[in-house]
A protein has these predicted regions:
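N-terminal secretion targeting segments of exported proteins
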Residues: 1-58, 184
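...with weaker cross-activation on analogous glycine-rich loops/strands in unrelated enzymes
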Residues: 2-8, 14-16, 35, 102-162
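Catalytic cysteine-centered active-site loop
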Residues: 53, 73-125, 135-136, 177-178
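Catalytic alpha/beta core of large soluble enzyme barrels
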Residues: 161-171
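Short, low-complexity, Pro/Ser/Thr/Gly-rich segments in the mature regions of secreted, periplasmic
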Residues: 175-184
């Protein structure tokens, strides 16, 4: 098929498709009945998501996506905030949030005091999640911070895996979960 014939055929198909969709829209075919599409103002306001939460959710997704670029980056306790060659848990969260204009304190304990409390059941992507784990843990003190990545997963760094994604609802992370904070 030569280029001219191909182009003519493509234009004909495109024009026919456009005319067909226009006819469907003009007749109302493929749309919901008026009664089904009518929604009271009260129902809309009760179920609506505020612009702030949509923006925060979008920023949370951006924070997590940016953090995923560092998967496998090694862990070092007390890591300097001036390098991305290695992180500890709180320098990692501090670094990835700073890219999106959120200035977090340096330590996981200090980070656990900013923002507002949020239940585990109401976590949104980008929320900070805190644990009492490791040799310094007593079950009540914050020793670790992660970022909620959605679908029951956390993005964080610790030990030999370095920056990694873990399941919040199993193993050590389920047992040592303390609380969560929303900073977006």
């Amino acid at each position: 098929m030569n280029k001219q014939h191909w182009f003519k055929q493509a234009m004909t198909i495109g024009l026919c498709t456009t005319i067909g969709f226009s006819a469907l829209l003009a007749t109302g075919a493929g749309t919901a009945p008026a009664a089904a599409s009518a929604v009271s103002a009260d129902a809309v306001s009760a179920d609506s998501v505020s612009a702030d939460s949509v923006s925060a959710s979008s920023t949370g997704s951006k924070v997590v996506s940016f953090g995923k670029k560092y998967l496998g980056t090694r862990y070092q306790f007390g890591a300097s905030t001036s390098t991305t060659r290695y992180f500890d848990c709180s320098s990692f969260t501090q670094y990835i949030f700073k890219k999106y204009g959120v200035d977090l304190p340096r330590t996981s304990v200090a980070q656990s005091k900013v923002g507002k409390s949020v239940s585990k059941a109401n976590l949104r992507v980008g929320d900070l999640v805190f644990f009492s784990s490791g040799s310094r843990a007593n079950g009540k003190n914050v020793t670790h911070v992660a970022v909620y990545a959605g679908n029951g997963k956390i993005l964080h760094t610790y030990g030999s895996p370095g920056v990694t994604i873990s399941d919040l609802n199993s193993g050590n992370w389920k047992k040592t979960y303390l609380k969560s904070r929303r900073v977006l």
